[in-house]
Amino acid sequence: MFTNIFNKAIIKTIFFLIITYIALLSKIDKVFSQVIDSKYYDWTVYEFQESEFDYKKCYIVSHPQKIDSDDNSRKKPYLMITRYQKNRSEEVSVFGGYEFKTSGEIFLVIDAFQFHLKAKGDMAWAQSRYDDISLIETLLNSAVVRIRSDSAHGKYAIDEYSLKGITLAYLRMKEICR
């Protein structure tokens, strides 16, 4: 009789553990992963949250439509605007696909405007919050941006990004990361 009660307790415990495991797996899908929220022409909106207790990070990303580069080993570059839910701030960054030249600057040309981003490793960022705001405003009101960068190995790249869809993607990013 004691064995029968003990076996039932083990079966109940195993059943409870299986149900708990399944419940945790369903939550893991949403936590520790980036989720594509939507796509607007050349721009994709992503949402990221490390845990259900953390603030979200949302970002929009685009890849170049045209690439002029003498580096065949280069990874796929991208232009990104990130919004942090916690402090409701936005940041522009560029992934070059290679290590940028040490102490190098990345040049963004949008219409008649030129912006300089500070490079570190394979990423580059605007130099201040004010520059981020100004750059985002210019991106939202333009059609094309060209980005010129130099690699740490003496290679170069000029990437041309379409800004078609950036305004809708930006508004959606702000909506989901309020």
Named regions from a protein language model:
Residues 1-11:
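N-terminal secretory signal peptides that target proteins for export/translocation
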Residues 31-178:
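A generic "folded-domain core" signal
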